[in-house]
């Protein structure tokens, strides 16, 4: 009996040791797993350079703060197309898109928590931009303002408003100019924008594609461009191009959000939230400014004030907000569909 009892005790000790050891190994493994984490940032077309720069800065900050190594993967394309990709299953932890409507489209599918606009400052728009013209050296066609775009011999490069956020800003800026110079007549604005699109030889799906068409393929006389994209082209290609600032443009406000459903699935909410929060710090704002986005932090904006020209700007509010603008101009059967004649 004593031998049997001793054997039972021995078996219990061995089992307990095995369970303890297994738990310890599991804990160590789990701890090691948390030493590194990966995020996916699904963004719009011309933010590649911005987020390569920012990701390195954020990773350094996060490592120092938490000891955790964070790797941020990037996905880029036309903003509308990117929003559709997330809706269709691309598992973004964060989205950094060209405009509010595209983020709201993801929210409407239940992937982003309601009220995302108010979670961060400036309606979750951490930096600003606008639309300018990029022309070839010497400005051979003498392009100075929007009305020059409809001269007989001018070819205009702009992306497709159905897929590109930048293209929608381009379109609305042109519409605003036409309204201003035609006593706010929507009919005359529609006619002007229709005429403008007859000068567009090709519609790329995103802003970077249009830049490639203009800069590398040599197609067109003027590129309607994000301001940061125009600055970047000048930086990379020197004196081959010039930037023309039109008399009127539009305040472009790219917006950001955590994709709630995906961060819950990936267990990345904490780092994803911090990733967007850090865009608003002085360091994050300087990264944006270095990449030719207009910072919203007053101190950093002052530091870079000489970099950005002063502009007369309309805002999306002048179009009744993005829901109304999208429905009126860019939804199926909207104004763009009515005026654009496919080549």
What are these regions (language model features)?
Residues 1-38:
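Short, low-complexity disordered leader/linker segments with a strong preference
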Residues 31-164, 305, 341:
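N-terminal segment of the mature folded domain
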Residues 47-53, 162-191:
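Bilobed "Venus flytrap"/periplasmic-binding protein-like clamshell domains
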Residues 55-64, 87-91, 100, 107-111, ...:
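Sec-exported extracytoplasmic/periplasmic mature domains
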Residues 132-134, 242, 255-257:
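Residues embedded in well-ordered beta-strands
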Residues 138-144, 163, 176-184, 262-270:
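Short helix-loop capping/hinge motifs at secondary-structure junctions, enriched
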Residues 181-247:
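Ligand-binding pocket segment of bilobal, Venus flytrap-like solute-binding proteins
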Residues 263-343:
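Extracellular/periplasmic juxtamembrane helices and adjacent flexible linkers that interface
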């Amino acid at each position: 009996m004593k031998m049997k009892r001793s054997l039972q005790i021995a078996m219990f000790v061995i089992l307990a040791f095995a369970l303890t050891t297994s738990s310890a190994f599991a804990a160590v493994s789990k701890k090691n797993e948390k030493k590194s984490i990966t995020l996916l940032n699904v963004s719009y077309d011309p933010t590649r350079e911005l987020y390569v720069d920012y990701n390195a800065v954020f990773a350094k900050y996060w490592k120092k703060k938490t000891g955790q190594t964070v790797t941020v993967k990037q996905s880029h394309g036309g903003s509308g197309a990117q929003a559709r990709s997330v809706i269709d299953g691309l598992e973004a932890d964060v989205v950094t898109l060209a405009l509010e409507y595209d983020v709201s489209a993801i929210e409407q599918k239940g992937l982003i928590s309601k009220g995302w606009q108010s979670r961060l400052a400036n309606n979750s728009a951490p930096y600003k931009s606008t639309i300018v013209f990029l022309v070839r050296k010497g400005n051979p066609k003498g392009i100075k303002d929007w009305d020059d775009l409809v001269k007989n011999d001018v070819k205009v490069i702009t992306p497709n408003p159905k897929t590109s956020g930048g293209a929608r800003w381009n379109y609305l800026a042109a519409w605003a100019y036409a309204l201003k110079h035609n006593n706010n007549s929507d009919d005359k604005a529609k006619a002007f924008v229709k005429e403008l699109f007859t000068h567009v030889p090709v519609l790329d799906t995103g802003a970077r594609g249009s830049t490639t068409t203009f800069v590398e393929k040599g197609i067109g006389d003027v590129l309607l461009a994000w301001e940061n994209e125009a600055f970047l082209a000048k930086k990379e290609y020197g004196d081959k191009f010039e930037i023309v600032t039109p008399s009127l443009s539009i305040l472009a406000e790219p917006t950001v959000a955590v994709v709630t459903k995906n961060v819950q699935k990936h267990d990345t909410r904490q780092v994803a939230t911090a990733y967007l929060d850090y865009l608003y710090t002085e360091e994050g704002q300087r990264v944006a400014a270095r990449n030719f986005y207009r910072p919203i932090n007053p101190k950093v904006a002052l530091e870079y004030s000489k970099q950005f020209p002063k502009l007369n700007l309309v805002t999306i509010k002048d179009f009744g907000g993005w829901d109304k603008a999208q429905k009126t101009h860019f939804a199926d059967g909207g104004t763009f569909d009515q005026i654009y004649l496919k080549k």
